[in-house]
Regions:
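Soluble catalytic regions of large protease machineries
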Residues: 2-166
Length: 166
């Protein structure tokens, strides 16, 4: 997903059977801090959940459950887009930080709905990209399961080969 959204280089991928997988990525600095960049980040963070739904036809709690999970990070990012980054659909010029978004969601159901809407849009976008790039997705998944870990050169070769395929 990181590659498909042109967020920067993918430096490696790994599967850790005890803790799940992880990726090592870089980011292009020329495109950060725009609404599009933040929406791409949300899409990237929701991609694992979208992949589970597409491949397994169900989702696990793997995308959530902890404060550093993809779901927690995406929720915080969507919250910040609404409240502190100037991209909110309501009062975008007000800077309204908060340490605990969950407490705010309990008091402001409209804000919770807007944040949830951003997460749903990112999930839908991730699923659409994965469907469109299914051969690349499958090639990466197969290679990763076979190797358990891949460096930047290996990942880049798979992405390049898939991008060149008709």
């Amino acid at each position: 997903m990181h590659h498909a959204l042109d967020l920067g280089p993918v430096r490696g991928l790994s599967i850790d059977s005890g803790e799940g997988g992880y990726n090592l990525v870089g980011f292009h600095v020329w495109a950060t801090d725009t609404r599009d960049w933040y929406e791409n980040m949300l899409t990237m963070l929701m991609a694992g959940r979208a992949a589970e739904q597409l491949v397994l036809k169900r989702v696990s709690s793997g995308s959530g459950g902890t404060d550093d999970s993809d779901l927690a990070r995406a929720t915080r990012l969507a919250f910040d887009m609404e409240r502190t980054l100037g991209f909110g659909s309501e009062h975008p010029l007000l800077y309204r930080p908060h340490r605990n978004p969950g407490a705010v969601f309990d008091r402001e159901p409209e804000l919770a709905a807007r944040v949830h809407g951003r997460l749903e849009a990112a999930l839908d976008r991730a699923a659409a990209i994965l469907r469109r790039r299914r051969p690349t997705f499958h090639a990466l998944a197969k290679a990763l399961f076979d190797a358990q870990a891949m460096d930047q050169a290996t990942v880049s070769q798979i992405l390049t080969d898939s991008d060149l395929a008709p």
